[in-house]
Amino acid sequence: MVALIDTNVILNYITDREDRFRDSSKVVMDLCSQGKVDGYIAFHSLSIIWYSLRIPDEGKRMWLKDICRLLTVAGASHDQVLEAIENVQFKDFEDCLQDECAKMVNADCLVTCNLKDFKMAKT
């Protein structure tokens, strides 16, 4: 199974933050590390994670390298980014980019803690 892992799942995993999806986020990441799920991370999630972590830069680099060893970075084409900009069905542009990245890697699913904002997702 190919899955694009949304930023919030990865942040739950890294920070162990109190969230109702905390345990599920860990399970998803464990499945990726065991090779049971072919996990991807959207290219722009890396900068969001960097910005969100409240730790020294050395720690941020360590976490990003670990995540990139665990998940493959997925991009989006120029045309897909333009399509995301024009897509008025998504309220959040970043979520639309997640969906475009999932489409780019032919993901079977997009794993997120934010189900309500992905009702219009193609994946």
Predicted regions located by residue number:
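Generic alpha-helical structural signal
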Residues: D23-K26, R61, K65-C68, L82
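A short, flexible beta-alpha/helix-coil linker loop
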Residues: I10-L11, L46, V81
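Structured loop/turn residues at beta-strand edges in well-structured enzyme cores
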Residues: I5, R69, V105
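Short, well-structured N-terminal submotif of metal-dependent ribonuclease cores
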Residues: M1-G39, L53-G59
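Active-site neighborhoods of divalent-metal-dependent phosphate/nucleic-acid chemistry enzymes
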Residues: T72-K116
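Anionic, Ser/Thr-rich low-complexity intrinsically disordered regions
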Residues: V37, I41, S45, M62-K65, ...
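Residue-level signal for well-ordered alpha-helical positions
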Residues: D16-R17, S52, N87, A121
